[in-house]
């Protein structure tokens, strides 16, 4: 039985706590009207958001090289993305989540699963930096609108498209692939996982990181529930 790569569980655990903090600040600022200019009127919000989503995508790309069934992983992510879309559409607290981070992970995992034989022919030492360059070059593509309907999933939103969390395939497939190629670099010619990947310096965070998907699905309803409870008794 393959040992679990605990260092990524630890990183995920830390990132999940950061994500919960980010969404708590978002809710307080945009749903409860708190005056938080450091969050709403500065680049800090974008940096914080990127530090969460980019880590998730990079690690997911790395881990797909170790998965026995990436099609199954993609289907699990897709089901979770559907749940998020339904919940945010039916419960109108904020904009519904169309093509959010979980959708992106589902799409990227599915794409890699189907193209893995081709991707393996690309030198990882060239593939990783190339993907990072492509990520930077395509970063602004989904930040404008296009007079073409039904392509928001790819990265070309139409003028009427709205989403509370938007991570289309372009440019984020390239961050995912950067993780994929980084894994192949680290594994080397013999395809073994490096020893540092089994480090477990913070077991509590590693334990949290092993349950990233359920944590993602539940943390925002819990935060909103706590805030509603606090405000109802004030």
Language-model-derived ranges and their functions:
Residues 1-234:
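Alpha-helical transmembrane segments and their immediate juxtamembrane cytosolic regions
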């Amino acid at each position: 039985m393959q040992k679990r790569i605990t260092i990524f569980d630890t990183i995920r655990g830390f990132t999940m706590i950061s994500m919960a903090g980010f969404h708590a600040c978002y809710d307080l600022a945009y749903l409860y009207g708190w005056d938080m200019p450091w969050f709403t009127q500065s680049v800090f919000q974008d940096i914080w958001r990127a530090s969460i989503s980019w880590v998730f995508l990079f690690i997911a790309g790395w881990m797909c090289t170790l998965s026995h069934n990436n099609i199954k992983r993609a289907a699990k992510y897709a089901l979770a993305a559907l749940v998020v879309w339904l919940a945010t559409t039916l419960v109108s607290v904020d904009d519904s989540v169309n093509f959010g981070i979980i959708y992106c992970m589902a799409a990227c995992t599915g794409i890699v699963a189907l193209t893995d034989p081709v991707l393996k022919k690309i030198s990882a030492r060239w593939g990783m930096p190339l993907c990072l360059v492509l990520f930077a070059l395509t970063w602004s593509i989904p930040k404008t609108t296009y007079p073409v309907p039904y392509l928001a999933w790819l990265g070309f939103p139409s003028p009427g498209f709205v989403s509370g969390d938007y991570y289309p395939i372009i440019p984020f497939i390239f961050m995912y692939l950067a993780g994929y190629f980084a894994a192949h670099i680290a594994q080397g010619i013999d395809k073994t996982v490096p020893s540092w990947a089994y480090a477990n310096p913070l077991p509590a965070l590693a334990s949290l990181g092993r349950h990233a998907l359920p944590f993602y699905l539940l943390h925002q309803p819990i935060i909103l529930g706590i805030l509603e409870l606090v405000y109802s008794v004030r």
